[in-house]
Curated annotation (Swiss-Prot):
Protein name: Mu-theraphotoxin-Hhn2j 1
Disulfide-bonded cysteines: 50-65, 57-70, 64-77
Compartment(s): Secreted
Propeptide, chain numbering: 22-48
Membership in a protein family: Belongs to the neurotoxin 10 (Hwtx-1) family. 15 (Hntx-3) subfamily.
């Protein structure tokens, strides 16, 4: 039962992709399709002024984003719990 439902869903997705591909004449079809599916332009890098969780940092320079702190031991940004 689960396998037949999975195959039916996969078939519908494949039908949607093939139908959309037949209408699209642009060469950038895969990028366009992915950006429409996820509704985010993931192919253009987004820069931010602070470093997030797990990014390397230098202790004492305050490079990490708000609610994060640079670990003296590991030298990467971690979540600051307020202690």
């Amino acid at each position: 039962m689960k396998a037949s439902m999975f195959l039916a869903l996969a078939g519908l997705v494949l039908l949607f992709v093939v139908g959309y591909a037949s209408e699209s004449e642009e060469k950038e079809f895969p990028i366009e399709l992915l950006s429409k599916i996820f509704a985010v332009d993931v192919f253009k890098g987004e820069e931010r002024g602070c470093k997030g969780f797990g990014d390397s940092c230098t202790p004492g320079k305050n490079e990490c984003c708000p609610n994060h702190a640079c670990s003296n031991k590991h030298k990467w940004c971690k979540v600051y719990l307020g202690k």
